[in-house]
From Swiss-Prot:
It catalyses: RNA(n) + a ribonucleoside 5'-triphosphate = RNA(n+1) + diphosphate. This is DNA-directed RNA polymerase subunit omega. GO terms for biological process: DNA-templated transcription. SMART domains: RNA_pol_Rpb6. GO terms for molecular function: DNA binding; DNA-directed RNA polymerase activity. InterPro entries: DNA-dir_RNA_pol_omega (IPR003716), Pol_omega/Rpo6/RPB6 (IPR006110), RPB6/omega-like_sf (IPR036161). Its EC number is 2.7.7.6. Gene3D superfamilies: 3.90.940.10. Promotes RNA polymerase assembly. Latches the N- and C-terminal regions of the beta' subunit thereby facilitating its interaction with the beta and alpha subunits. The RNAP catalytic core consists of 2 alpha, 1 beta, 1 beta' and 1 omega subunit. When a sigma factor is associated with the core the holoenzyme is formed, which can initiate transcription. One of its GO terms (cellular component) is DNA-directed RNA polymerase complex.
């Protein structure tokens, strides 16, 4: 089933390929830092219903797509180089191996 807002996401990029790359890279960042670096507010986070109740959805791709829909993420040219951004994110959100 397609995610809600997929048409809006396609309208934000020049190709399906770019959307795939942007979402995949953001999902990797979210997983690497255990979702601590999300731009979503708690009430905006994707939810998953289980027998025990409602929990944050563990699917990083869903989170990345939802983040992109908020307009709080930027992608494209003339941004901070990826290696510099990665160092800053590691400083702010250390992974378990680094902590």
């Amino acid at each position: 089933m397609a995610e809600p807002g997929i048409d809006k996401l396609f309208g934000m990029v020049d190709s399906k390929y770019r959307l795939t790359v942007v979402v995949a890279k953001r999902a990797q960042q979210l997983l690497r830092h255990r979702f601590k670096n999300t731009v979503l507010e708690p009430e905006e986070r994707p939810k998953m219903r289980t027998l025990e109740g409602l929990y944050d959805d563990p699917n990083a791709v869903t989170w990345a797509m939802k983040e992109l829909l908020t307009g709080r993420l930027f992608f494209g040219e003339n941004l901070v180089p990826e290696d510099r951004l990665q160092k800053e994110m590691e400083r702010l959100y250390p992974t378990e191996e680094e902590a």
